[in-house]
Amino acid sequence: MIRSLLLTSAVALAPVAALAATPAATTPAATAQATPVAAQVGPQPTLPEPQRGLLPDMKVPRPATWGDAVPTVPQGYSVTAIATDLKIPRQMLVLPNGDILVAEGSGGGAPKLRPKDFIAGFIKNLGKSGVKGGNRLTLLRDADGDGTYEMQGVFAENLNAPYGLALVNGSLFVANQDAVVRFDYVDGQTTANGPPVTLTTLPSEINHHWTKAMTASADGRFLYVGIGSNSNITERGLAAEQDRAMVWEIDARTGAHRPYATGIRNPTALTIQPGTGTLWAVANERDEIGPDLVPDYLTSVQDGAFYGWPFSYWGQNVDPRAQPQDPEKVASAIAPDYALGSHVAALGVSFSNAAMGGQFADGAFVGEHGSWNRSDPVGYKVVFVPFQNGKPAGEPIDFVSGFLVDEGNTRGRPVGVTVDPKGALLVADDLSNTIWRVTPTR
């Protein structure tokens, strides 16, 4: 039935799509993919003229197998698979004893509004794993510290699309798609002691963006949870966006919460910067205004700040699709700190530490899941953003690549990234259902 609808929709829309492919303006910047990818990273990305059309460019590389291959890492580092046969691994948490918790699951399922939603959904699904999400937490243990995680077992199951994880004073918090829940945790335990207790519910109606990123404040008093929008650009109306496209601050003891920062379309990963205690996020920006708009980004998250969605992007660049317009909100919008490139789909972020060594000792690792709405795929790798004096400084460096075989095939898609205290980068790959571990070889 869906295939029939897709074919019917594609035929019906073909004449209009052909017209929509005409550039929105005659300037070189408005020509399809005229903006170099390198020009769209950093604190001041190039922003071309928007291109409107019924259908964006769509290409998703099909799943390929790793075989004997492994991802590519810089000289002086090695990479190994420490866990396989997972069920859609998303985010990870390194526990005090070195054990690793992996959140596995899939959520969402928002009703389709338009024929092109069915088409886009069909295209996106071509690049996904055929494995059903586990809706569980898996625990990995390397008991003798030799880098081989000989234990892989279920810590907790029957969860509801778990994503964000945080450990605070003996409480393990899990951000399901509909609630933050809490398990009691004792160092070294391998399974949860009974079902979790709900700390607070989270917006889950419609669930266009279902992932709930989470991290804890440096003092453990608060949890920060990222809640994505219920649409690309308010197609369901502003009422459907109540309590969405924002980061909540939640009291870890009582569950009381407030909006911490707003106007962030889809904050997919959160982390606290060591030393400063500052909250940082990666976010996925809006679609359907061209292959080179709008850059996904890495940014510090300021208390009370508005980051533009849906009324504007990258500060105060107005998006007329959001109706009714709100000039007052646009005037208050601030630009993010650092562009990662349009449609790279950043889903993970973790700050480095000195143990990672060399040029990778000070900065942030970002997992880029990869694009679906560009004719030339971007992302599909982990990049390192160097920092200086607490801020991004310099161009991103490919740190884990080799996922993308060519434009039509990919072996993996990075999601969560986590640096452990020993100086290893962990990468969750939700296509090959693998956890990769990258370590210095010195």
Over which residues does each language-model region extend?
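Beta-propeller domain segments
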Residues: A30-V73, G109-L113, I119-K128, K132-G134, ...
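Hydrophobic core register within WD40 beta-propeller blades
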Residues: M92, L165, M214, P267-L270, ...
